[in-house]
Amino acid sequence: MASAHIEHKLSLLPDLPGSYQMKDINGKIIYVGKAKNLKNRVRSYFKSSHDGKVAAMVSQVADFDFIVTSTDKEAFLLEITLIQKYQPYYNIKLKKGTGYPYIKITHERDPKIEITGTIRKDGGYYFGPYPNVYAAQETMHFIQKVYPLRRCNGYQGRPCLYYHMGQCLGACFRTVPEKEYTDQIERIKRFLNGNVGKAKASLTAKMERAAKNLQFERAAEIRDQLHYIEQTLEKQKIISHDNTTRDLFNFYMDKGWISIQVFFIRQARLMKRESRLFPVVNTAKEEFESFILQFYSRRNNVKPREVLVPAGLDNKVLADILEIPVRTPQRGEKRDLMALAAKNSQIKLEDKFRLMELDNRTTIGAMKELMAALNLPMGHVAEAFDHSHIQGADPVSAMVQFVDGQPAKNNYRKYKLDADKTHNGADEAANTREVIRRRYTRLLKERAPLPDLILMDGGEIEMNAAKDVLENELNLDIPVAGMVKNNKHKTAALLFGNADQLINLDPKSQGFYLLERIQDEVHRFAITFHRQLHAKNSLASRLEGIKGVGPKTRLKLLRKFKTINKIKEAPLEDIQELGISKKVAQALKLSLTAEPTPARRV
């Protein structure tokens, strides 16, 4: 039986072609498939009976994801690419021995064209993968006839049979000029990249002549060659024929949330996709541009040769900061890929909204399961806390409240921490003690109801700090549990009890799903508040209101000084070296020296 989480996601699947990825409890992809209709195909795994390896695979599925494509064939090729990248356990088990061909031009003094199942870094040209082995072979044979290279085994002192048939340039008996090979390879590359107009026109004319001369078998053979070429070289939105490494970004915004898709194009294929969903604090344009810039500050994200973005962004500023070209596709395959990323962004966000609506209708019993897992009597109210800061700067905490499994948003609270006065903002224990002290001291003073359970995002440091304040300062007996995440930053388990016992919940249970929602919600709420506060103190924000400091000047200041304090401490001469007048430089330092209005404590 499918978990509530999977049941909800099944109800949101679109009636569109695409590739789906089954994941285990750790978020690892264990199976990749394709579908003409994602809704029907994915639902069949959980709504029909299976046996053998398929049943074993389904029993391991804790979640799934999908990527929408424009055609069935794109779904097929995307499936191939993802299988080759992730090597999912059950694809290997279910499809052992299955390979997908590439057409290759070898990197040799006398190159040849061949079919291969493996890409190697050997200097050769690779085209594919192709979904139809027979069609790829027929196309290769056609190329050998029309654009011959070497078809023999090399020099043997006399012309080979293929040379007499016009299918070999003659490496068998002569030294073929390198330019002759280079020109021929360029023709083949154009042909395999889809520029087949001349070849098809020539074949069509030959087919018509053969039919006119009553050579019907020859005409049928040429007709089949045309069919194979069209089938093999059909242009794909997913498989780019340009080997430039690219990252493609697009987004969709609605109801205060932004959904971002990142397509990683490597070796002429979509190698990976990342999705992000988060609430919008500024405009969609500002959030999107900020996301792109922060994306490449992450340790594992290597910059590509080119970044593609939708229209409406400041491409020049992005390119200057990233130091790589940032372009907006205007036509052709890249524009189609951009539209596909936008479509996936929209589907992802609309799915989230529908899932949230379903969540609110299916939380009965979830709180009971959660309390039972902790061996506690039935409770109704849970309050969860999370902290947010950037290396200790602008530290904040946030609290969300859930009543009978439903978010009680009127009771959410934000806390601007006094870290600068009392402790380091990166001290999680001190942050926890402060927010717990403030929250429950106030409830005691107001004689307000206390929660049945407190959840701390983090681990034993946060949990024990909260228990210390409650028990030793406020004399309160409220159960406290720590919400633990795995290495993929996903909800994994609870810490609870005097011995900090790790409690693993059934990931398919309503209780686990409620815990996951609470953890995601408090994290979202804390991050949103921190962004709002940090924006007030950020360099870019402070610079925007200063007369004479326009976008270009802001960019220069950002790149040279990085922080407000460095500008404050810089001599006027250093600022003027950027082409800024003395009057503007003085106004800049005066404005930045003035303290911003303090935020009201909640």
From Swiss-Prot:
Recorded GO molecular functions are: DNA binding; excinuclease ABC activity
Q: Which UniProt keywords apply?
A: Cytoplasm, DNA damage, DNA excision, DNA repair, Excision nuclease, SOS response
- Broad class of where this protein is predominantly found: cytoplasm
**Location within or outside the cell:** Cytoplasm
| Cellular component terms per the entry's GO annotation | cytoplasm; excinuclease repair complex
Q: Which PROSITE patterns match?
A: GIY_YIG (PS50164), UVR (PS50151), UVRC (PS50165)
Residue ranges of domain GIY-YIG in the record: 15-92
The record places domain UVR at 197-232
Q: Which superkingdom is the protein from?
A: Bacteria
Q: One GO BP annotation here?
A: SOS response
Task: Please explain the role this protein plays, according to its UniProt record.
Answer: The UvrABC repair system catalyzes the recognition and processing of DNA lesions. UvrC both incises the 5' and 3' sides of the lesion. The N-terminal half is responsible for the 3' incision and the C-terminal half is responsible for the 5' incision.
Subunit (UniProt): Interacts with UvrB in an incision complex.
Q: What is this protein called?
A: UvrABC system protein C
Species whose genome carries this gene: Lacticaseibacillus paracasei (strain ATCC 334 / BCRC 17002 / CCUG 31169 / CIP 107868 / KCTC 3260 / NRRL B-441) (Lactobacillus paracasei)
Gene of this entry = uvrC
